[in-house]
Amino acid sequence: MSANKLARSAQGLQSSAIRELLKHSKMAGVISLGGGIPNPDLFDREGLKIASDAVLSQHFGEAFQYGLTEGVPGLREEIKRICEGRGITCKADDVVITSGSQQSLDVLARALINPGDTVVVERPTYLAALQVFGLAQANFESV
């Protein structure tokens, strides 16, 4: 697709640093210490099987459907209870479940960052956070 058909905000986008790291993590002989790719041998296969079987036997009708965008009400209620146990007052409606760090950072950036704002990040930092904050047109200050 030619760049002039893209929105101005998309015309200068570059490949993500994470995408570049993932390419290297797949190379023979490379032991990845990043990229969010844990060793599958470390997964709790039996525990995952038990959990999967429980979901499929108890909630089959819902397991393969789209859910509420803010998350499953029972999970949000449980998180509210955990927060209250730690002295944090909130309602289940205050809790939003996301599909991982990228979505969480994107939601936060859209809600809290205006173009030109400065975001303080630690050094070293999570590369994907820089990508999200960059799309929000933020400046970075590392500490």
Model-based region annotation:
Residues 57-143:
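Conserved core of the PLP fold type I
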Residues 1-69, 73:
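N-terminal "arm"/small-domain region of PLP-dependent enzymes with the aminotransferase-like
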